C-alpha cells in the first residue's frame, strides 16, 4: 500500500506487519506529515537495516515537474505522478494564511465551455495520497504551514467522492487543517450533493453556478442538460438541512453572457431563502475560448443589485494571472511547449 494518506492506526498496523514494534507507527506518522519525508531511507529514527531494505517502498510523494511564481507571490506547480501523468496545484499566500488549490482528477470530464482544464479531456481520478501530496508539496516549498485547502483545481471532486473524502479526513486529522478551512467546489451532479452531505463533513461547500437560468447554464456547462437548475437548487437546500452549513455559489462573470442586470435579479431569486453566499469571480481569459471579463463598472453594478436584494455577496479576483495560474491554464500552456 502507499503510505501517504494513511491514518496513525493504519500506519501502526503496517509497521507491525513488517515485523517492527508498534511505536514505529507513530514515528512514521510524524515523519510523513510533520517532516514531509519522501523516502523511508531518510527516517533516521528507524534501524539502518530496515531503512535500506524499505528504501524503495512507495510513500506516495510526487516530483515538481514545473514551477512558476507570479508577482503577487502565487506559485503554480505541475506535479508528475508515479505513472508520469501531470496535475496542477497552486499555492496562494496572503498576510495570515497559505491556501492550496488542489486537483481531484487528471483532467476533467465536465468540459465546461470557459475552462482550460476541460479542453484537455479526462484521464483518471486521483488517489487520496495524490491529493494530500499536493498540500505537503506546497507547504514544503513555501516553508510555511498550509492553513486552507480548496478543491478548485483540475477535476470534478464529486466524481471522486471516496478518495476526496479520505483526503479530507487525512488533511484534517493527520496534517492538522481544520475541516472548516477545507472547501469542496462542484459544478453539481445528480444525487452527488446528497451523497457528500451524508458524510457529515464540516467543510465549506461551494457550487459553481455561473448562470442564473437553465438556458445559459446549459451552454456553459454541458452536464447541466441532464441536471436542471431548479433541481440543483433543491439539492443545495437539502444540503443545508442535512449539514447545517451554508452553500457558497461561485459565479464567474462573463461579459455579455451572464453579467446583465436581469441575470443578477434572477440569481437573487435562486439563492434567497436559505443559508447561502455568492462569490462573483470576474473571468480570467484563456486563449482557447472567446469569453471576456466584464469591466469594473459592470461588475460593481451586478454586485449592487444582489446587495439590494439582501444577498450576501463578495467579489473575488483570480490570483497569479501573470503565470497562467487560473485553473487549467499552466498545464495546457506547458504541455503545448
Curated annotation (Swiss-Prot):
One GO biological process term:
tRNA methylation
Question: What GO molecular function annotation could you give as one example from this UniProt entry?
Answer: 4 iron, 4 sulfur cluster binding
- Cellular compartment(s): Cytoplasm
Keyword annotations of the record: 4Fe-4S, Cytoplasm, Disulfide bond, Iron, Iron-sulfur, Metal-binding, Methyltransferase, rRNA processing, S-adenosyl-L-methionine, Transferase, tRNA processing
Superkingdom of origin organism:
Bacteria
- Cofactor(s), names only, from the UniProt record: [4Fe-4S] cluster
**A GO cellular-component term linked to this record:** cytoplasm
Q: Which residues form the Radical SAM core domain?
A: 94-324
Indicate which residues the UniProt annotation says bind S-adenosyl-L-methionine: 155-156, 185, 208-210, 284
Gene3D superfamilies, alphabetically? Answer: 1.10.150.530, Aldolase class I
Give the EC number(s) listed in the UniProt record: 2.1.1.192
InterPro entries for the chain: Aldolase_TIM, Methyltransferase_A, RlmN_N, RNA_MTrfase_RlmN, rRNA_lsu_MTrfase_RlmN/Cfr, rSAM
Q: Which top-level enzyme class is recorded in the Swiss-Prot or TrEMBL entry? A: transferase
Comment on bound cofactor: Binds 1 [4Fe-4S] cluster. The cluster is coordinated with 3 cysteines and an exchangeable S-adenosyl-L-methionine.
Reply yes or no: does the keyword Nucleotide-binding apply.
no
Q: Which PANTHER family match?
A: 23S RRNA METHYLTRANSFERASE, RADICAL SAM CORE DOMAIN-CONTAINING PROTEIN
Q: What else is known?
A: Reaction proceeds by a ping-pong mechanism involving intermediate methylation of a conserved cysteine residue.
Q: Which family does it belong to?
A: Belongs to the radical SAM superfamily. RlmN family.
The protein depicted here goes by the name: Probable dual-specificity RNA methyltransferase RlmN
Q: Lineage of this protein's species? A: Bacteria, Bacillati, Cyanobacteriota, Cyanophyceae, Oscillatoriophycideae
Amino acid at each position: 500500500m502507499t503510505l501517504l494518506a494513511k491514518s496513525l492506526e493504519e500506519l501502526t498496523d503496517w509497521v507491525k506487519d513488517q515485523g517492527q514494534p508498534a511505536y514505529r507507527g507513530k514515528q512514521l506518522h510524524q515523519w510523513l506529515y510533520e517532516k514531509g519525508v519522501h523516502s523511508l531511507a531518510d527516517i533516521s529514527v528507524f534501524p539502518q537495516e530496515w531503512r535500506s531494505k524499505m528504501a524503495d517502498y512507495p510513500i506516495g510523494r510526487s516530483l515538481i515537474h514545473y514551477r512558476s511564481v507570479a508577482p503577487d507571490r502565487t506559485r503554480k506547480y505541475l506535479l508528475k505522478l508515479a505513472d508520469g501523468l501531470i496535475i496542477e496545484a497552486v499555492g496562494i499566500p496572503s498576510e495570515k494564511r497559505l491556501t492550496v488549490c488542489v486537483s481531484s482528477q487528471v483532467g476533467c470530464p465536465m468540459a465546461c465551455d470557459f475552462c482550460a482544464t476541460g479542453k484537455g479531456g479526462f484521464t483518471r481520478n486521483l488517489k487520496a495520497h495524490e491529493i494530500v501530496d499536493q498540500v505537503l508539496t506546497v507547504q514544503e516549498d513555501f516553508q510555511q504551514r498550509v492553513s486552507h485547502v480548496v478543491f478548485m483545481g483540475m477535476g470534478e471532486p464529486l466524481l471522486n467522492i471516496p478518495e476526496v473524502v479520505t483526503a479530507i479526513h487525512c488533511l484534517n486529522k493527520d496534517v492538522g487543517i481544520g475541516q472548516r478551512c477545507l472547501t469542496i467546489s462542484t459544478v453539481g451532479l445528480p444525487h452527488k450533493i446528497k451523497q457528500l452531505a451524508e458524510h457529515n463533513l464540516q467543510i465549506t461547500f461551494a457550487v459553481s453556478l455561473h448562470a442564473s437560468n437553465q438556458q445559459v447554464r446549459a451552454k456553459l456547462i454541458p452536464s447541466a442538460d441532464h441536471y436542471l437548475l431548479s433541481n440543483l437548487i433543491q439539492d443545495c437546500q437539502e444540503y443545508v438541512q442535512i449539514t447545517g452549513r451554508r452553500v457558497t455559489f461561485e459565479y464567474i462573470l462573463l461579459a455579455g453572457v451572464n453579467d446583465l442586470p436581469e441575470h443578477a435579479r434572477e440569481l437573487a431569486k435562486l439563492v434567497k431563502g436559505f443559508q447561502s453566499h455568492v462569490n462573483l469571480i470576474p473571468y480570467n481569459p484563456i486563449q482557447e475560448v472567446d469569453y471576456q471579463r466584464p469591466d469594473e463598472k459592470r461588475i460593481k453594478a451586478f454586485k449592487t443589485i444582489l446587495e439590494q436584494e439582501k444577498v450576501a455577496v463578495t467579489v473575488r479576483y483570480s490570483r497569479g494571472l501573470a503565470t497562467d495560474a487560473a485553473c487549467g491554464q499552466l498545464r495546457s500552456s506547458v504541455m503545448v511547449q
